[in-house]
Amino acid sequence: MTLTGINQLWVADIPYVRLKGEFVYLAVILDSFSRKVVGWAVDRTMMSHRLTVAALERAVADRQPQAGLVHHSDRGLQYASPEYVAALDKYGMVASMSRPANPYDNASWESFMKTLKQEEIYTNRYNDLEQLRTNIEEFIEEYYNRQRLHSALGYRSPEEFEQQSERKQPANSRGATVQFTVNDENEKQASTWITGEGDSNAVPFPRPQPF
């Protein structure tokens, strides 16, 4: 699939995060063109459609995509639920799910998860859901999308990359190819990537210190 701009391919997944005494779930939607996080939500359960729909609604409110956007996910029940499928239909999105013989290339998602682990999750101990929500919002909205440089984007942040792409190049003049490859292990491990006791290589992002 060749991407020529934003809001053509969104990739969604649900990792889980360890809190003090419990696990909670983080639904994230990533724009594959710019690697920008366009929607996210956290909740104590992923057994209903509430978590995933909340992330989707947030993404739609922020991006206002046109019909025809491809929404890719694994085959989890949360993304296959009637409520979530109805939400995709409501916004004219094309649902795409990984199959045993043809999972999607997870390069942009893996890159985001690695950054989230090393620069946020593994450098903090969260006491409760509200603390996690506050930290995740600050990490995504203030740092990752606006400041974090990506080698794949020419050492630009997702927002800078989007702005320069829109300003300097027509939407149909820039092509970026997303290669679909077989990698069953990525799908199997999708909900375990950001758990753990910590990592010796973890480096926190430069969160502003309170006065």
Question: What do these predicted regions represent?
Answer:
Residues 1-211:
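Charged DNA-binding/catalytic regions of mobile-element recombinases
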